Amino acid sequence: MDINQMTYAVQGALQKAVAYSKEYELQNIEVEALLKAAMNENDSLFKSILERANIDVDQLIKAYDNQLSHYPTVQGDNVQYGQYISAKTNELLDKAEKYMKSYEDEFISMEHILRAAIDTDETTQKWVGNKVEVIKEIITKVRGGNHVTSQNPEVNYEALEKYGRDLVEEVRQGKMDPVIGRDEEIRNTIRILSRKTKNNPVLIGEPGVGKTAIVEGLAQRIVRKDVPESLLDKTIFELDLSALVAGAKYRGEFEERLKAVLKEVKESEGRIILFIDEIHMLVGAGKTDGAMDAGNMLKPMLARGELHCIGATTLNEYREYIEKDSALERRFQKVGVSEPDVEDTISILRGLKERYEVYHGVRIQDRALVAAAELSDRYITDRFLPDKAIDLVDQACATIRTEMGSNPTELDQVNRRVMQLEIEESALKNESDNASKHRLEELQEELSNEKEKQSSLKSRVEQEKEKIAKVQEKRAELDSSRQALEDAQTEGNLEKAAELQYGTIPQLEKELQEFEEAFQDETGEDSERMIREVVSDEEIGDIVSQWTGIPVSKLVETEREKLLSLSDILHKRVVGQDKAVDLVSDAVVRARAGIKDPNRPIGSFLFLGPTGVGKTELAKSLASSLFDSEKHMIRIDMSEYMEKHAVSRLIGAPPGYVGHDEGGQLTEAVRRNPYSVILLDEVEKAHSDVFNVLLQILDEGRLTDSKGRSVDFKNTIIIMTSNIGSQVLLENVKDAGEISDDTEKAVMDSLHAYFKPEILNRMDDIVLFKPLSVNDMSMIVDKILTQLNMRLLDQHISIEVTEEAKKWLGEEAYEPQFGARPLKRFVQRQIETPIARMMIKESLPEGTIIKVDLNDNKELDFKVVKPTS
C-alpha cells in the first residue's frame, strides 16, 4: 500500500492510529485504532457522514475503545508500538483501494475508508445497521459529482456550505432582523441581477449605512415572493472570505477552495447568487509569486454571466482596490447607498424595536428611538446612520437589562445595613457591661425594623421580577407567532396563516396589553418601581454622554444650580471683569438649555486687554467650573505658530510630509474631547495665514484635517486672547475703571488693522478687559492668600493676614501696565519666603497659626501662635 496514494486526511488518521496503538500497548495498527483516528481528524468527513445518518458517533468511538482494550498487549523496553499494520487493517485498506478505483478517483479518501469499514469491520456494521443505503446517498451528495484528483479533496466537498451561509434559509428560520426602507436600492439591485450579462451589482457606501442590510432585504423579499419571477427560485449565499483563506497551508489550496465554490455556483445554473461582503479583499487575495489572485479568477465568469455576484464595499476601498483594476470594475454595476436621514432612521428603529424588546426583555419608548436618531446624528459625527443610532438603542437596552439582573439600590443599601448590624450584634453579645447591654437592646430593635424593611423590599422586587418575566414571555410568544405566520404565508398554508392572523396573534396581543396594564396598576408609574424595565430618552442621552463626553442628558438638580450660579463661580476667580464673565456664562447656559445654534460653536470670543488682567484665567476658570478640571482645556500657544507653514501643525501635515499619520494638534485634541474649552493664547503672535483655518470653525463649527476627516467643533467654546490695543486702554481708562467710547473705538481700530474683517465678523463677541484698579488688587490678595492657605493645609499650618497688611500688599504691588502678576511675585517675596524660612529653621507643630500684620515702619511682622497642648 503506497502512502502517497492516500489523501492528507487518511495519512493523518494513520499517524493518529500509531499514537492510539502506543496508548493501548499494541504492536500492530488495528482497524479500530484507524477508524477511531478517522473519527477524530479535524473537520472529519468520516464523522460528518455518520452524524448525518443519525448514528451516535460518541457511542461508536466508545465501542472502538472497548474493542481495542481486548487486544493482547506487548510490553518491554525496546517495543515499537504501531510498527506494523494488522491483517484486518490491511484488508480494510485493500477494500478502500477498490472503492477508489470504482469511484474513478486518484487517491484513497475518507469516504473510501468508510465504505470499506462498513464492508469489513463488525463493530461498524453493528452500529450502521440498515443505514448503508442512506450513507451511500450522503456520500454521493457530499461529493457532488467531483472526483478525488488531489490529496486534499475535502475542500471541494460542499464548498458553499463550508465557506458561506445561506441568507434565504436564515430568513426562513427567523434569524434575521427585519429590513425597513431601502426600497429604491433593493429595486436597483433586482434590475441589475435581471440583466443577461454583467448582472453583478456592487453596493458602495460609507460604513454603517446599511449595505449588508440591502442584501438581507433582498433575501427577505425572495422568501416573501416579492420579487420578479426570474428571482423567485434564487438563493443568496454570503461568502466568508476569512474561512476561505484560513488554514490554506499549501500553495494553491486557497485557489482550489475558491474554484470549488465557483464551480458549485456555476453548476447551480444561476440559482445561487453569491454575496461577497468587503469585496475589495478579493483583489490581491491568494496572490503569491506567479500565482493568480482571486479577483482575476472571478473575471471570466463575471463577464460571461455564469456568476451572479453582489459585492459590498466602502467608497474609499472601492477607489483604492476595485477602480485600480478597470477590467474587474467594468464587470460590476455600481449601486450607491447613501446615509439615511433622521426620519428614515427613526422608521428603521421602529421596525427593529420589537426584536430588541424581545431579546433584552425590556420596553422601549418611542421617544427613546427618536432621541437615538437625533442625538446620534448631532453628536456622534465620525460614524453613520442608522448604525450609530441602532448601537445607541442596543447599548441602552443592555444597560437596563444589566440593572434588572441586579438588586435595586434601595434593597442593596438595606442588605448592607442589616449585615453591618448583625456583625455589631454578635460582637456586643460577648460584652457584659450595662452600656453594651443597653446598646444591644437598641441595636436589636433597629435590626428588627431593618429586617422587616428588607423582607418587604425583597417581596416587592420578587413580585416585580415575576410580572416582568410574564410580560417578556408573552412578548417572545407573540414574536414567534408572527414568525410562524410569515412561514405559513410563504409555504401557502392558508389555514394555519388564518388561524394565526385572526386567532392566536390578536389573542396574544390582548393578553400582553392586559399584563402590561395590570403591571402598571400594581406597581404604579415607572418612577415608583423598584426595577426599571423601560428604555427612555434619558438612557439614550446618558449613553451619548458616556461615548462623547458631551452633556446631553437631562439636567439634574445639582447641575441646574451649578449652571445658574456659573457667573458667581467665575466672578470669585476672575476679579474686575464683569462683562467678560457674564458673556461667557450666558453662552454656556444657552448651550446647555439646548437653544443655541446647532451649527456653530457654543461661543467664540476675542479677549483684548493688557497683560495680567485675567484673560487666560477666565478660560481656565470656565474649564474648571464646567469639567471640575483645567485639564479639559485645549490650550494652544499661538506664539508657536509664527511661521506661515506652522498652520499644518494645527490640522496635520499634508500627505507625503513627515508626521502625516499623527494628525493635527487642534483637530486630534477636539476629536478626543469634543466638549471642551479651546484657548488660543496670544493670537497676535501667530502668522496671519493661521487665522484662515479658523474661518470654518467660527462659522460652520467644523474643520477638515489633513486626512480629509471632518472634525466637529459645535460643542466647543473658543476663546482667543490678545494684547492688541492694551497701550490705548492703559493710557485712557477712567478713574472708575470704565472704558470710554473713544478708547473702545481706538482699540477696535488697532484690531481691524491687524485682523481681517472676515475673522472679526464671525466672532460672537469682542470683549475689552479693563486694567485692574487698586480695589481689585485687594480682592486678588485675598485670592492669592486663600491659595497659599490651601497649600499649607497638608502641613496643618495656616496664616492669618490683617486687613491693613492686605491693603498694603495691594497698594505696594500695584502696577497698572502689568496687571496682577507683579502682586503674585510681591506676595512670594514678602510672605511666602519668610514663612518658608521659619518652617525650615524651626519645626512648626500641627495646628500652628502664623499671624501677619503691618508695623509702624510699613513692614510685615510675623507672629507664630503654637497650639496649646
Swiss-Prot record:
Sequence segments annotated as region (Repeat 2): 85-145
UniProt-annotated stretches for the region NBD2: 559-771
GO CC terms, sorted: cytoplasm
Keyword Membrane: no
Region (Linker): 340-549
Family: Belongs to the ClpA/ClpB family.
Residues noted as binding ATP 1 in the record, renumbered to the chain: G205, E206, P207, G208, V209, G210, K211, T212
Domain notes: The Clp repeat (R) domain probably functions as a substrate-discriminating domain, recruiting aggregated proteins to the ClpB hexamer and/or stabilizing bound proteins. The NBD2 domain is responsible for oligomerization, whereas the NBD1 domain stabilizes the hexamer probably in an ATP-dependent manner. The movement of the coiled-coil domain is essential for ClpB ability to rescue proteins from an aggregated state, probably by pulling apart large aggregated proteins, which are bound between the coiled-coils motifs of adjacent ClpB subunits in the functional hexamer.
Pfam families xrefs: AAA (PF00004), AAA_2 (PF07724), AAA_lid_9 (PF17871), Clp_N (PF02861), ClpB_D2-small (PF10431)
Biological function: Part of a stress-induced multi-chaperone system, it is involved in the recovery of the cell from heat-induced damage, in cooperation with DnaK, DnaJ and GrpE. Acts before DnaK, in the processing of protein aggregates. Protein binding stimulates the ATPase activity; ATP hydrolysis unfolds the denatured protein aggregates, which probably helps expose new hydrophobic binding sites on the surface of ClpB-bound aggregates, contributing to the solubilization and refolding of denatured protein aggregates by DnaK.
Region feature (Repeat 1): 6-71
Gene3D superfamilies for the chain: 1.10.8.60, Clp, N-terminal domain, P-loop containing nucleotide triphosphate hydrolases
Protein name, entry field: Chaperone protein ClpB
C-terminal, as annotated region: 772-869
Assembly behavior: Homohexamer. The oligomerization is ATP-dependent.
Cross-referenced CDD domains: AAA (cd00009), RecA-like_ClpB_Hsp104-like (cd19499)
SMART domains: AAA, ClpB_D2-small
Region (Disordered): 442-465
Superkingdom of origin: Bacteria
Coiled-coil features, chain-numbered ranges: 390-524
Keyword Cytoplasm attached: yes
Gene Ontology molecular functions: ATP binding; ATP hydrolysis activity
GO biological process, one term: protein refolding
